[in-house]
A protein has these predicted regions:
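Transmembrane alpha-helices of multi-pass small-molecule transport proteins
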Residues: 34-83, 110, 170-178, 193-211, ...
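Specific transmembrane alpha-helical segments of multi-pass solute transporters/efflux pumps
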Residues: 21-23, 52-99, 104, 140, ...
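Loop-to-transmembrane-helix transition segments
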Residues: 7-15, 42, 62-87, 160-168, ...
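C-terminal-most transmembrane helix of multi-pass membrane proteins
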Residues: 1, 44, 220, 248, ...
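Glycine-/small-residue-enriched transmembrane alpha-helix faces in small-molecule transporters
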Residues: 1-42, 79, 87, 149-181, ...
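Specific alpha-helical transmembrane segments that line the substrate/conduction pathway
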Residues: 38-49, 81, 89-122, 248-267
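Helix-helix packing/entry segments at the starts of transmembrane helices
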Residues: 42, 100-106, 178-200, 232-268
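Hydrophobic transmembrane alpha-helices of multi-pass small-molecule transport proteins
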Residues: 51, 114, 123-146, 204, ...
C-alpha cells in the first residue's frame, strides 16, 4: 500500500468535509448581519491566528522567514485563493448551497487542462473517466435543483449566484495547479500557507474596522471564528499539503467529495433539502472520487 498516497487522499477528503460546511455557515453569518466584505476581511485574520498557533505546536516549528521567490509564489497563491473564496462565498449569498458547490466543482476540468499545460501531467484513461463522471454528477445535482428551484430570502438571485460559482470553479482549478507546483518545488507548505493568509490579512485589514461598527452579537463572531479556522484555514492547509502526495488533477477529482458533504450539512444547518434526483448526482460524484483515488502511473 502506498501510504503517502493514502495520506494525500485523507487530506483532500478531510478538507472537503470541512469546506463542505462553508456554504451553510456563510448563510448563517449572513443572518447574523455579516456582509460579504465582513466575511472576506475577517476570515483570513482569524485563520492566520489559527495557522500560527498550529505551526507552534509542531515538533519542529518552522521559521516563518521566506525569501523573494517564495514570497512571490505565496502572493500569487493568495490572489488565487482569494478570488476562489470571494466568488464562492458571494455565490452563497444568491444561490442554493448545492448549486454553489456543484458549479464551483467544474474545477477538475480546469485543473486537468492547466496541469497538462503547465506541469506536464498526463491524465490517464481511468482518471479521464473519473473527471467525466464527476462533472456529469455535479451537473446532475445542478439540474435537479434547477428543475425545482425557487427564490427564497437565502437564495434571492440564483442565476447570478450560479455564475459566481462557475467562476470560483475556474479559479479553484488554477489554484490546485499552483499549489501542487509549490509543494513539489519548495516543500515548505505550512510556511507558504501562513504567508498567504498574512498577505490577505494586510490587504484586507482596512475593511475589518467597518465590521466593528455593526451590532453583531457574540454568537455571530463565534460562528465567524469557526468558519475562519475550520472552514477556511484548515482546508486550505490540507489542500496545499496534499500537493506533496497527489497530482493536481487527482486532488481536484477527490475534492468533488465536497458536494455530498455540503448537501448533508446544508440539510442539517439551514434546512435545504435536495430534490430526490440529486442523490443520483451524488452517487456519480462518489464513483468519481473512488476512481480518482486509484493510482494511474
Amino acid at each position: 500500500m502506498d501510504f503517502k498516497r493514502v495520506k494525500g487522499v485523507a487530506l483532500v477528503l478531510s478538507a472537503s468535509a470541512l469546506w463542505g460546511a462553508s456554504g451553510s455557515l456563510t448563510k448563517i453569518l449572513k443572518l447574523h448581519g455579516f456582509s460579504i466584505t465582513d466575511i472576506l476581511s475577517w476570515r483570513y485574520f482569524i485563520g492566520l491566528g489559527g495557522l500560527i498557533a498550529f505551526s507552534r505546536m509542531l515538533s519542529e516549528p518552522p521559521a516563518l522567514h521566506i525569501d523573494g521567490p517564495r514570497f512571490r509564489t505565496a502572493l500569487f497563491m493568495a490572489v488565487c485563493i482569494f478570488g476562489t473564496n470571494a466568488a464562492f462565498t458571494w455565490s452563497n449569498f444568491f444561490t442554493t448551497v448545492a448549486n454553489a458547490i456543484a458549479l464551483s466543482f467544474t474545477a477538475p476540468l480546469f485543473a486537468a487542462g492547466l496541469a497538462w499545460i503547465f506541469l506536464g501531467e498526463t491524465v490517464r484513461i481511468l482518471h479521464q473517466v473519473a473527471i467525466g463522471v464527476g462533472f456529469f454528477g455535479a451537473y446532475f445535482v445542478f439540474g435537479a435543483y434547477r428543475a425545482a428551484e425557487t427564490h427564497t430570502a437565502l437564495s434571492p438571485n440564483i442565476p447570478l449566484g450560479n455564475g459566481l460559482a462557475l467562476l470560483s470553479g475556474l479559479l479553484f482549478g488554477w489554484y490546485i495547479v499552483v499549489a501542487r507546483r509549490f509543494a513539489q518545488r519548495d516543500g515548505k507548505v505550512v510556511v507558504g500557507t501562513i504567508w498567504q493568509f498574512l498577505i490577505l490579512t494586510v490587504l484586507l485589514s482596512p475593511l475589518m474596522i467597518l465590521t466593528l461598527f455593526k451590532r453583531i452579537t457574540g454568537i455571530g463572531y463565534l460562528y465567524l471564528t469557526v468558519y475562519s479556522t475550520l472552514c477556511t484555514a484548515a482546508p486550505i492547509l490540507m489542500l496545499n499539503l496534499s500537493g506533496l502526495f497527489l497530482k493536481a488533477h487527482e486532488t481536484s477529482i477527490l475534492a468533488l467529495s465536497e458536494v455530498p458533504f455540503s448537501i448533508v450539512i446544508g440539510m442539517i444547518l439551514v434546512g435545504e433539502f435536495p430534490p430526490a434526483a440529486t442523490w443520483w448526482g451524488v452517487a456519480l460524484i462518489l464513483v468519481a472520487g473512488f476512481l480518482g483515488s486509484m493510482r494511474q502511473d
